[in-house]
Amino acid sequence: MRSAFFLGVDAVAISNRSTAPVSPVALKASAGASESLPLISVNQPGTFLDSCRNNGWKIYAANAATGADPNQRSGNKTYVSASALGNPIQNHACILILGSEGEGLRWNIKKKADYDVCVEGPRMGQGRVDSLNVSVAAGLLCETFLRRPKRIGAPRDDLPDGSQARNHQEVTSGELLF
């Protein structure tokens, strides 16, 4: 919850059936974020997701990377790596669903997703570590979803000293922009 609040998530929905109740220890660890971030208690996650979709939301299911090409389409679902995701929240309201540490998402919930999204590391397929723990993956995915687009150039009249700003077409590769 702390990372979700810090990164700008609007609310967190928690299933009543398949998750442990939010404990006082978890609330304390959230460092106050749980008091500022709406927590939605969901009795029927499948029905909740259907209702969200009917109201225009896109649903993304976080899954462990498999090593196969993640940027593909199968049936009515698109598989995408976080690095190729872009900034989906700029285009539509989004729900990111996360599963448990060991089991991941239940099949009946996973099938509700429009997209399967994974975080791929540079060492995929090398060694025995093939995934992240859920909290780390959640933080990385939330940052990806909520990342603000970078402004490369400023309007000509934005600079206080009267100097001229370059527009984005004038920026060449290899330049470092802050």
Can you say where each PLM-predicted feature lies in the sequence?
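Post-transcriptional modification and biogenesis factors for structured RNAs
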Residues: 1-178
